[in-house]
Amino acid sequence: MTVQTKTKGLAWQEKPLSDNERLKTESNFLRGTILDDLKDPLTGGFKGDNFQLIRFHGMYEQDDRDIRAERAEAKLEPLKFMLLRCRLPGGIIKPSQWIELDKFARENSHYRSIRLTNRQTFQFHGVPKAKLQTMHRLLHKLGLDSIATAADMNRNVLCTSNPIESELHRQAYEYAKKISEHLLPRTRGYLDVWVDGKKVQSSDDFLQEDEPILGKTYLPRKFKTAVVIPPLNDVDCYGNDLDFVAVSDGNGQLAGFNVLAGGGLSMEHGNTKTYPNISLELGFVPPEHALKAAEAVVTTQRDFGNRSDRKNARTRYTIQNMGLDNFRAEVERRMGMPFEPIRPFKFTGRGDRIGWVKGIDGNWHLTLFIESGRLVDEGGKQLLTGVLEIAKIHKGDFRITANQNLIVANVAEADKAKIEELARTYGLIRNDVSKLRENAMSCVSFPTCPLAMAEAERVLPDFIGELDKIMAKHGTSDDYIVTRITGCPNGCGRAMLAEIGLVGKAVGRYNLHIGGDREGVRIPRLYKENITLPEILSELDDLIGKWAAGRDTDEGFGDFAIRTGIVKPVLDAPVDFWDASKAVPIARA
């Protein structure tokens, strides 16, 4: 490592460490005093460091914000409970597992629902503290866990839901699982607290523990990884810290991976030191070196990532601080080999194929559209029960997609009719879903997310309904615009890779971004700030009218907005995301 590289990448060391670094150092490898808090009947939540530590175990403490003021008036603490996010690399789950998870959701969660996420897993919302060990022991019995699905670790690893290319998908999925396992923390703290219920008696009990990859203070910030199979970019690969783009050998077999790093979509309103950015190309590696590449990127981020300012701690800021060439050189040094040149690849879209598709192996796959990923029995719909009934007879597997949908995968020809009958009976197959709605997404936001500034999941259905009317008015109902709503600027709804992105600013108010593309490779530009949903619809009515009248053949809304100068493209986010006047095209020889 050269002095120049080290100095450039580690300037943050001159400042005090964030308190999260103390917390991790003193946590006894993530155990803290969580077991003591579990025994405390006076509060539904966790105290002190434990409030943060449970995140490393895949949970967030939340409360029902709809009734927070009411409970405060009654001199009661907020109705506290936990969100749990399962670790499920590639989103594949067995029907037998689903049946048990459904039972837990109905009997033990406040909202009696299962939420499919755009990180290809499921979440329980509203789990009381008294049921947490029961929940984790159930996951353990089912061969599942929730370790490292939150906090400063490598989160759930995504993999393109591509059952048509069955062999290539199988190989890519195996690497998604291997990467997930390789980058897991080695501490027994998760098992000790949630499964065994064993309290560490002295420091001797954990002196033998080690974290050879993550280190005893783990990563500076969250770290997201995805495996993607072009031409489908369903996992939004440009929004992750680390991406493995599968390259086919031309015969349906895996030739290796293009490695990208430095994507991320969170920011802070008004803080120009924060910005979303797309991931950048490092190079190509053959399959046998994929784990080595993953470890090298993670340890480079571990050692160079900012541990003083958490708002500038993600991998994209590390690359910006070091410079891409220096970052790549450091990764290659740790790999012990250079990257090969990037192999050509291209994305053509990222939406799921709703309905039946046949794989090359002869099996059928039914993709069910699940709006915002929420499976619940309410409002005359029995979506949760519908999936349960399918699980009781399904002989294949389920695949949760990064678009918050559910694939009933590997269905034999003889079983198709019964599966479809159940799906239609319970409203899992609908004939009234527009292309616009199929390509819309939201985060959870109110009432459970403590960071929510504005509604997202609860307003999406009606907002898309109004947008559908505008599309019909301008004769574009057979087309779609990738539209996403997120309740705050932390990026969970991936609005910063949408053609139309709404980012919550305050209750009932949003920033409107436009100019992303259908393939998910361009960040949208801020168009209007701090406006209401009716105002947004009025703006979009005008813009969609212009798009309908002046678009080129097959030109998406975002591309049209850029071509016609409605907004300037975000070309280099660290430079021009906050200042469009600096969006100057890079001259190429």
UniProtKB/Swiss-Prot annotation:
Family of this protein: Belongs to the nitrite and sulfite reductase 4Fe-4S domain family.
Binding site for siroheme: C492
Single Gene Ontology BP annotation: cysteine biosynthetic process
Official protein name in the record: Sulfite reductase [NADPH] hemoprotein beta-component
Needed cofactors: siroheme; [4Fe-4S] cluster
Cofactor note: Binds 1 siroheme per subunit. Binds 1 [4Fe-4S] cluster per subunit.
EC number: 1.8.1.2
Function: Component of the sulfite reductase complex that catalyzes the 6-electron reduction of sulfite to sulfide. This is one of several activities required for the biosynthesis of L-cysteine from sulfate.
Matches recorded under Pfam families: NIR_SIR, NIR_SIR_ferr
One example GO MF annotation: 4 iron, 4 sulfur cluster binding
Classification via PANTHER family: SULFITE REDUCTASE [NADPH] SUBUNIT BETA, SULFITE REDUCTASE [NADPH] SUBUNIT BETA-RELATED
Enzyme's top EC category: oxidoreductase
Annotated binding of [4Fe-4S] cluster, by residue: C443, C449, C488, C492
